């Protein structure tokens, strides 16, 4: 399993109506709980009713310096690029990728 940086939020899934994140750090756990996320196994999840609610929740996660998981297809990094291309999200965000389980790279887009 990949090492997650201390005191971070890693967004693992944002394609459907449920957002799935992994959170390290008690302060951030409290903040995302306030946003409505609940524990589900090793993740925290939150369901949204529509695309507008999802975009607003993504904005809140970006304010908390969340890292969007890099990958191809409908990984969070690609979904964010799609939202930017369509004008649904403006602004910067960060993606995280791993070259090996304990070595990660963070990039701002």
What positions do the PLM features span?
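Accessory DNA-engaging acidic/polar modules
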Residues: 1-109
